[in-house]
Regions:
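Bacterial Sec-dependent N-terminal signal peptides
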Residues: 1-16
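Short S/T/G/P-rich N-terminal loop/turn motif that feeds into the first structured element of a domain
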Residues: 12-243
Length: 243
């Protein structure tokens, strides 16, 4: 079973240069149900308050498919889009739960720490992307964690690919590319780029969607940018549970 929890706020826009934090989370198998219920029932209202108060643009939580966890070490990915320093999280939780005491809010906030651990965080800078229908969240999202071989050349290749994918690759409902920030990207073992492929069905996700692109278009694109610019380290599959 491949599922995803997703709290999304469709009036928000991700723009070039926005910071998106990917929080890779590990939840033990016997705690998954409790963890996901906690996130929906308690963190969900706080996330909505954070968006309405301008704390961030968007927040999503996805469950990773079991067959994508091999060598990954995480079971969920939380996605924090364009988080701002103000208002404080204390103020956000007060807005979400105005009728609860500070102690009660603190208990709710701390409960999550008993249910999961953060494997690592990756701050990324949004480069480019599209959604065919901004009012609909595609059911399937595949995260490709990539190590670039020629960093700047690969970024330019993906930026140019965005319009090609949007025009010709009708099998995808959306696509995004981001670059990872921080010194960790200099490590040989670390990924430094991520692309996200979005689909409305698993049938489409399991097809070679790029085969829809005319050969002459891809040939011209490859001649301009070259090939063998990246290595996909992990291909992380997720699907939609709650929206």
């Amino acid at each position: 079973l491949i599922l995803c929890i997703s709290f999304t706020f469709l009036n928000s826009q991700v723009e070039e240069g926005n910071t998106v934090r990917l929080q890779f989370i590990k939840v033990e198998e016997d705690k998954v149900e409790e963890f996901e219920s906690y996130m929906i029932e308690y963190v969900g209202p706080a996330a909505k308050a954070a968006v309405s108060e301008g704390k961030m643009e968007n927040w999503l939580l996805r469950r990773v498919a079991k067959n994508s966890r091999y060598n990954a070490g995480f079971s969920h990915i939380a996605i924090w889009v364009a988080t701002n320093p103000e208002p404080s999280w204390t103020q956000v939780w007060e807005k979400a739960y105005p009728n609860l005491s500070a102690d009660a809010r603190s208990w709710i906030y701390g409960k999550g720490e008993e249910l999961y651990s953060t494997v690592y965080n990756a701050n990324c800078e949004y480069i480019a992307g599209f959604l065919r229908d901004p009012s609909t969240i595609p059911n399937i999202a595949i995260f490709n964690l990539i190590k670039s071989k020629k960093y700047n050349a690969y970024i330019e290749q993906e930026k140019d690919a965005k319009d090609i994918f949007e025009k010709h690759a009708k099998g995808i409902e959306g696509w995004h590319v981001m670059k990872r920030k921080g010194m960790v990207v200099n490590s040989e073992g670390a990924w430094d780029m991520v692309t996200i492929d979005l689909f409305d069905t698993w049938e489409k996700a399991n097809q070679n969607w790029w085969s829809e692109i005319p050969r002459n278009v891809m040939k011209k694109h490859n001649e301009k940018h070259g090939s063998d610019l990246r290595e996909i380290r992990h291909r992380v599959m997720t699907g939609l549970l709650f929206d």
